UniProtKB/Swiss-Prot annotation:
Tissue expression from the record: Expressed by the venom gland.
Gene Ontology cellular-component annotations: extracellular region
Name of this chain's protein: Scoloptoxin SSD996
Taxonomic source organism: Scolopendra dehaani
Residues in the signal sequence: 1-25
Localization (cell): Secreted
């Protein structure tokens, strides 16, 4: 009975370790901020520029594109 409890305890600890490692894995996303080139820059321009710079022009990989003043914030899939 003691052996069974010991094996069960080790199995539970291993399951916990594996689940922690899975939650800290890379999500395949990145984010960055860059200065906009002119004042007429729109949110859509920000999204297109983010796609051009960081995803080889793939617009569907851009998750978030925000324009705040003279900065463009992008979050995208890598």
């Amino acid at each position: 009975m003691k052996v069974f409890i010991a094996v069960l305890s080790i199995a539970i600890v291993l399951i916990i370790i594996v689940s922690i490692q899975e939650t800290t894995a890379n999500t395949g996303e990145a984010e960055t901020t860059f200065a906009v080139p002119n004042k007429k820059f729109t949110r859509e321009d920000c999204k297109k520029e983010c796609a051009r710079r960081f995803t080889n022009g793939v617009l569907s990989k851009v998750i978030i594109a925000k324009l705040t003043g003279t900065k463009c914030y992008c979050k995208y899939k890598t």
